[in-house]
Amino acid sequence: MKILGIESSCDETAAAVVEDGSILHSNVIVSQIDIHSHYGGVVPEVAARSHIEAINPVITEALEKANCTWDDIDAIAVTYAPGLIGSLLVGTLAARTLAILHNKPLFPIHHVEAHVYANFVTGTTESNSSLVFPSKQPEFPMLSLIVSGGHSQLVLFHNHGDYDLLGQTQDDAVGEAYDKVAKIIGLPYPGGPSIAKAAVLGDPKKYLFPKAKLQNPYDFSFSGLKTAVLRSVQAAVGKDYTFPSHELPALLNEAMRNDFAASFQQIANETLVDKAVKAFDDYQPASVVIAGGVAANQDLRKQLKERLPIDIEYAPMQLCTDNAAMIGTLGYYYAQKMAPADPYTLEVVPSLSMTKTAWNKQEHKI
């Protein structure tokens, strides 16, 4: 079964063709990072306009690279939640139109849940691909640490669509904290890669930042860590809280910037690993997967390898950040259990918890 996946929830326009929830035939991504880096973050209106320009060419290219016509496509899967409303509308409108035009079943996909399913792709038919895939699909029960710019969650999957949300961020997601700290210390957007690069040259023990203590041992909080970095930067350059934060980077030298990056990254990743290790000890899953853009962080991978008594096989870097391969992959599993959506009435949902999409429950139809 070949699924055309379409993703446009934030600032990547993507389309992919995935077969049987595991084999990647094409994966096309148009990123807007260069556009939004001028603003220090994603501008929703700019993102939506860029999606409008890219969506049709991206879908066409994905089909061409997969050597597929519409007769070869069995269904369409598209991100409908969560995300920026304007961005979501572009992708879903394209998917709805194509589903009607070509008479294809349409499956609405939850973006955060889909990140987990990037780990289910085990191969590709693209001859020139340099991607390295996991040797096998994860086994259930599966513990998933989902870490991205908008989400930080620990989820225990019992089976496809059957999962429990163990914990989540109570304020900033870890990827959001990376972006904000990068801005504080004068590193470019996006903050994840910038901080990781600077941290290699810094001392992770130079500044000791706190870890949040929460009632739920699996929940996350990064707003306090972000504030602690801000206060430490102010102290390091001899300024108090009244000094404009946007002027702080000019007062830092490169060594200070690297040390702040390394110290922040150390504690942020330690926090993630602490929660993952506790959940592993408590639930003893058969496999562990890391999903989302922050999964590409090499220090996070290193800490997990040192502290978890189980090997983790990672999705390729290109499938950690936003992509449509994960949408098409999850779409296949949706198609096994769920009725397709009505393309005439499907609406986007900018804010939607994974707990509202427990699709293993047959009474819940999207």
Spans of model-derived segments:
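Glycine-rich phosphate-binding/hydrolytic loop that grips phosphoryl groups
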Residues: H115-A118, P316-K356
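Glycine-rich beta-strand-to-loop/alpha-helix junction loops that act as flexible
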Residues: V78-A81, L98, S148, V289-N297
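Glycine-rich phosphate-binding loop plus the immediately following alpha-helix
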Residues: H158-D203, K226-Q234
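N-terminal beta-alpha supersecondary unit
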Residues: K2-D72, V78-P82, H115
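Short beta-strand scaffold segments in enzyme catalytic cores
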Residues: T13-E19, S144-I146, S152-L156
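Conserved phosphate-binding catalytic cores of ATP/NTP-utilizing and phosphoryl-transfer enzymes
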Residues: I109-M142, L330
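Conserved phosphate-binding/catalytic loops in two-lobed NTP-binding clefts
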Residues: P108-I109, V288, L304-I327
